[in-house]
């Protein structure tokens, strides 16, 4: 067959299935038969028209697992292998790439955002962007990328065992950060405005403490992570940070952040942005899943098929209160 099915977002608020040519093999790349796709907040934003600098139509999907159709040139991937797709396409030559930080490549293109992604039956990606997922289920493999974003933020913070750590925002990225902060030995407090989200979080991480916005105890923390996507919440982060602490911004928003310099300075605050993830983060996540330290079965709360995704995704976009991660079975 030379054609495949793809889920297209032709414009904000619209989705349709479309027949497209299957990608052709080319040097240095591997074709992947997509098996599972995690739906990210970015996908909901693309559907809703809230993603800036995006050109429609677009095939969404960057949280991907599938089966390799070709062998990689170095022999690490064989046909039929279950693989996790690293969706960050990088130039390899800019300052960030040369310095070991391709996650913030100056010319980065993310599958499903800047170029067409994986809500389809097959894609072709650079072989360096495929990581064998031996020992993982196909569903778990599709969740590695979003978990790696949380793991990367935690790695940036260099948490010490026992560090009192506040994570604001109990969506998927906040939960990912909470999971890996706990794995690093931190004492985790998870905060959100939604009682429903906090109840979900408690089911995923029963060892973490939770509190609702508006009911906070007036205490400070060694590290604060923001995963809200709210400028107001991000600007308030210093209120909860102890002296000598680290503030990590997992969220990115369009706008300016403002901190009172005396509060920022007297804490000798370490302020960190965290963007995407590195191969080492993907590897760490997969190792932790294999060891049973990541409750992947409790994270995948909803699922659908590619044929039904055009009907289900708008429903989930309208109300994500009871949803952690929805998975499309291709």
Annotate each language-model stretch with its function.
Residues 23-37, 50-95, 134-136:
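Glycine-rich beta-strand-centered segment in the early N-terminal region that forms part
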Residues 50, 193-194, 253, 277:
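Residues in the short beta-alpha loop(s) of Rossmann-like NAD(P)-binding domains
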Residues 216-224:
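A short acidic, Gly/Pro-enriched loop at the edge of an enzyme's catalytic core
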Residues 2, 235, 279-330:
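C-terminal hydrophobic helical "lid"/dimerization subdomain
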């Amino acid at each position: 067959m030379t054609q495949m099915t793809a889920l297209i977002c032709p414009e904000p608020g619209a989705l349709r299935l479309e027949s497209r040519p299957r990608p052709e093999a080319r040097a240095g790349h591997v074709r992947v038969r997509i098996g599972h796709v995690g739906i990210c907040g970015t996908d909901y934003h693309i559907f809703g028209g809230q993603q800036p600098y995006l050109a429609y139509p677009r095939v969404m999907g960057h949280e991907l697992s599938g089966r390799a159709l070709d062998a990689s040139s170095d022999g690490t991937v064989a046909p039929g292998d279950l693989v996790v797709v690293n969706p960050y396409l990088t130039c390899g030559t800019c300052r960030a790439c040369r310095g070991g930080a391709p996650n913030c490549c100056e010319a980065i293109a993310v599958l499903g955002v800047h170029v067409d992604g994986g809500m389809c039956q097959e894609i072709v990606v650079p072989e360096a962007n495929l990581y064998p997922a031996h020992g993982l289920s196909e569903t778990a493999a599709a969740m590695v990328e979003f978990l790696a974003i949380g793991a990367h933020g935690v790695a940036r913070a260099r948490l010490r065992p026992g560090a009192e750590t506040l994570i604001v925002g109990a969506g998927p990225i906040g939960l990912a950060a909470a999971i890996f902060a706990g794995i690093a030995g931190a004492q985790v407090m998870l905060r959100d405005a939604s009682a429903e989200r906090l109840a979900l979080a408690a089911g995923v991480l029963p060892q973490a403490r939770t509190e609702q916005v508006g009911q906070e105890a007036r205490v400070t923390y060694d590290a604060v992570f923001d995963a809200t996507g709210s400028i107001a919440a991000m600007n308030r982060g210093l209120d909860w940070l102890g002296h000598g602490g680290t503030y990590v911004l997992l969220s990115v928003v369009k706008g300016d952040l403002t901190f009172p310099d005396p509060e920022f300075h007297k804490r000798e605050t370490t302020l960190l942005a965290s963007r995407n993830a590195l191969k080492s983060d993907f590897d760490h996540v997969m190792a932790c899943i294999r060891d049973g330290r990541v409750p992947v079965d409790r994270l995948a709360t909803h699922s659908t098929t590619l044929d039904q995704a055009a009907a289900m995704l708008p429903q989930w976009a309208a109300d994500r209160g009871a949803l952690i991660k929805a998975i499309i079975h291709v």
